[in-house]
Amino acid sequence: IIVDGKNIITEITKAKAKVKSFSESIIIGDYKGFSGKKISDVVNIGIGGSDLGPSMVVESLSHYKTHLNTHFISNVDGDHINEILNKVNPETTLFIVVSKTFTTIETLTNAKSVKNWFLKAANVNDISKHFIAVSSNIEEVIDFGIDPNNIFPMWDWVGGRYSLWSSVGISISLSIGYEKFNQLLEGARKMDSHFRNSEFSDNIPVMMACLSLWYNNFFDYRTHAIIPYSENLKSFSKYLQQASMESNGKQTDRSNNLIEYQTCLLYTSD
């Protein structure tokens, strides 16, 4: 697969290998914090697709949880941050800062707050052992104090709402183990293959898209309720709201012409 003249399969393979190696070193305890203790908690700092997707999967697949406790910070609400930080020990916590540009205001505000909290128990040189990043802005990440070896790629061609299947999913890999994470990737690959290769009459995504347009434009049904029976899937509707409505809820087409029909249903939950 060629994007901008590059074979992205090579880059993807390298990224997967790096996620695998790092995840396994944390899980088995080879990777140590500044005091020599093993990592016990992981805190993902992101917003939008850098938070909704990973947090949904970690919650949904909690039955496969490793010994690591995984937390997510997205809201700039100070009470929310303090609630998470009160649960963790700076000596045994790994922080993942996820931002493609490393300039996202909410994410950087939270990352700086967490960094200040961490430095009350450690020194600046210890940041490299407890903070990693998923980003394309290498310079800004290094300025933050993160070890260049602990920067995971986030490519421009990966949309945020699909990013859980990229290096952004490292929190998933840490939470359930790389092998389970790789099974998730394989499931996504199989669905991609089904969509690309199946006839429209047997193509599940195509049929769902046609039904959505049909009900929206011909029956005037404007909402689609997503109500999971499994409690572990309670956050799935939030993720789907962003994935579907941000992808399909457009006013103009690719040629910037105004669209004269409804392009997306309003997704709701319980």
Question: What are the residue ranges of the model-derived segments?
Answer:
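Extended, hydrophobic alpha-helical segments in both membrane/secreted and soluble proteins
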Residues: 53, 57, 81, 97-100, ...
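Anionic-ligand anchoring segments at beta-strand to alpha-helix junctions in alpha/beta enzyme folds, i.e.
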Residues: 41-91, 227, 232-266
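N-terminal small/polar loop signature for handling phosphorylated ligands or for N-terminal nucleophile
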Residues: 18-29, 37, 78-91
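Active-site phosphate/pyrophosphate-binding segments
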Residues: 117-269
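Short, well-ordered amphipathic alpha-helices
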Residues: 21-27, 55-60, 108-119, 242-248
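Acidic, glycine-rich active-site loops and adjacent beta-strand->loop/helix elements
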Residues: 49, 76-77, 100-103, 135-140, ...
